[in-house]
Every structure is written in C-alpha cells, then in structure tokens.
C-alpha cells in the first residue's frame, strides 16, 4: 500500500507542477452493459462523475450544474451496479481503497497515479461525505474478508476551489456547486476520524495526505 501511495503522491506533484489531470470523455460509446463499458474505460476506480459520462448522448453536460444534478440518480445507479460487481469479484485478502476529501482536493488526480498498479484491488473515488454509506460499505468489505484503506487527501479549501473545482470546470470537466463544495470540506475530516475509530479493531488503515 505504501508503494501505491507513493505513485499517487507523485501524480499530485506533477499536477502541482502544471500537469493537471482532467478526466476525458471516452471515445467508445456506452454499450447496453454499462458496467462493462465503465470498466473498459475507467478501470476499477468507481467514480460517480465518470459514470455520468455514460449519459452524454442523453444530454448530460458536465459544465452545467442543473445537468449534473439531473443525471446524478442515473450515475448513482451505475455506481451501485459497479459496487455490486466489486463485491462479486473481489477475493479475501484484496483491498478496497476509499478515497476521501473535499471537492477539488485532488482525489481523482491521485487515483490517476495509482490506476496502473491496482492489480486486483478496487477504489471508490468519492468524497466520503456520507458517513452512513461509507459505514455500510466498510461493513460489507470486512464481512467478505477483504482489506479496507481510507486515503484522505487534504487541501486548503480555497486552493481546492480555485485550482481544483474551477480549473476543471474551465476545461469542460464536471462542475461542483459552492454549497456542495463547502459541505464536503466541513464534513469529511470528521467522518474519516469516526470511521477510523469504529473500524480500527477490524484492521482499517487510514492515510492522510496533504496536497499543497
């Protein structure tokens, strides 16, 4: 895990030096089996905003806040299918990585760095702003004998807003409303601390990485 984290941190440094990461829209059109389409294009890194790209042909516009909200239920349904597939495929001893951090903190950039080295592991690339959902998924992970890791990317909120949220929106990637942004940055650290305490006895590992 420590080596995997080194790859992620290296990618964050490249972004800080100007080599930003913006998730591109796949050239392959979505197929009837959205989970297979997703895995071919994004790998085992589960991300709601990537799932929304399956609906561009249906009118999804990542730069439009109303469109982002409109297609959130559809993309959430795809994510649920992917998580079901994850639990069907992952074997005991493998790892599920839970990303955590406010919007624009650099989670997906970090994931871009570890993507080639995941092997049989999976990543849930989300903010971890929902304590209930994270708790439920962690319970399932440990129930099947897999390992769980939380990687919390920490970034100054205004830096995350200016050089994370606004910059990616300017490049045509997904936008984030300010109120959602503020909620995640206020909530995530407490959620990580709560989960760390509750699941310590089951072997949950937590890594906190500052993205400066």
Regions found by a protein language model. Give the residues of each.
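Glycine-rich phosphate-binding loop of ATP-dependent small-molecule kinases
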Residues: 1-212
């Amino acid at each position: 895990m420590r080596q995997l984290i080194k790859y992620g941190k290296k990618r964050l440094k490249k972004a800080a030096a100007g080599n930003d990461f913006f998730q591109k829209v796949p050239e392959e059109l979505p197929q009837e089996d959205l989970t297979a389409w997703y895995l071919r294009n994004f790998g085992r890194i589960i991300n709601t905003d990537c799932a929304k790209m399956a609906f561009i042909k249906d009118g999804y516009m990542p730069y439009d806040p109303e469109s982002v909200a409109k297609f959130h239920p559809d993309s959430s349904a795809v994510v649920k299918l992917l998580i079901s597939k994850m639990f069907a495929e992952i074997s005991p001893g493998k790892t599920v990585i839970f990303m955590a951090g406010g919007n624009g903190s650099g989670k997906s950039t970090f994931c871009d760095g570890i993507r080639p080295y995941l092997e049989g592991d999976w990543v849930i690339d989300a903010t971890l702003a929902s304590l209930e959902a994270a708790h439920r998924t962690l319970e399932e992970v440990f129930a099947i004998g897999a390992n769980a890791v939380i990687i919390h990317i920490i970034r100054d909120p205004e830096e995350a807003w200016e050089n994370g949220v606004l910059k990616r929106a300017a490049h045509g990637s997904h936008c984030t409303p300010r109120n959602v942004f503020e909620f995640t940055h206020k909530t995530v650290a407490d959620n990580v601390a709560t989960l760390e305490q509750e699941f310590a006895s089951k072997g949950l590992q937590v890594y906190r990485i500052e993205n400066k």
